[in-house]
């Protein structure tokens, strides 16, 4: 089971769109095998980027409107938000290193100077 924050229509604005740090949203379903396989990879990414990348989960079966709003047709689908704006999407499985590279590619140049430490070090050495 993932340690990511469960997000629904009720708290999507607060947890994702109003977040002061980048947010990776995992659209998933309980019955989805690949979704279960990516969960530990997302947990590993969350541990490595703690405090500088938020990872949340949206159950597509419980959040049809939210899934439709973002055009979710396959799962797992990951959406990356920065400053309330959708900046990238990824569909399917990926390991922690691929996920980190995905995040790096899409937000590294957008990170403010306050982002330091292991998160930046990991980006520079991937």
Describe each region flagged by the PLM:
Residues 4-23:
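A short beta-strand-turn-helix
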Residues 121-124:
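Short, intrinsically disordered C-terminal tails of secreted or membrane-associated proteins
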Residues 74, 79-111:
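Non-catalytic, surface beta->alpha helical segment in thiol-disulfide oxidoreductase systems
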Residues 24-25, 55, 78:
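Hydrophobic beta-strand anchors of alpha/beta hydrolase catalytic cores
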Residues 20-21, 27-31, 74:
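Short pre-active-site segment immediately N-terminal to redox-active cysteine/selenocysteine motifs
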Residues 34-49:
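Typically the conserved alpha-helix immediately C-terminal to a functionally engaged Cys/Sec
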Residues 60-66:
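Structural microenvironment flanking redox-active thiols in thiol-disulfide oxidoreductases
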Residues 3, 8, 28, 54-56:
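Conserved Rossmann-like nucleotide-binding pocket used by diverse enzymes
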């Amino acid at each position: 089971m993932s340690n990511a924050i469960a997000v629904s229509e009720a708290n999507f604005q607060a947890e994702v769109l109003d977040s002061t740090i980048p947010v990776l949203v995992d659209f998933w379903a309980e019955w989805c095998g690949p979704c279960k396989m990516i969960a530990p990879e997302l947990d590993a990414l969350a541990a490595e980027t703690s405090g500088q990348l938020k990872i949340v989960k949206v159950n597509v079966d419980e959040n049809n409107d939210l899934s439709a709003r973002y055009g979710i047709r396959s799962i797992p689908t990951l959406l990356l938000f920065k400053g309330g704006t959708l900046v990238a999407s990824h569909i399917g499985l990926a390991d922690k290193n691929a996920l980190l590279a995905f995040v790096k590619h899409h937000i590294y140049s957008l990170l403010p100077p306050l982002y330091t430490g292991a998160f930046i070090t990991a980006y520079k050495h991937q």
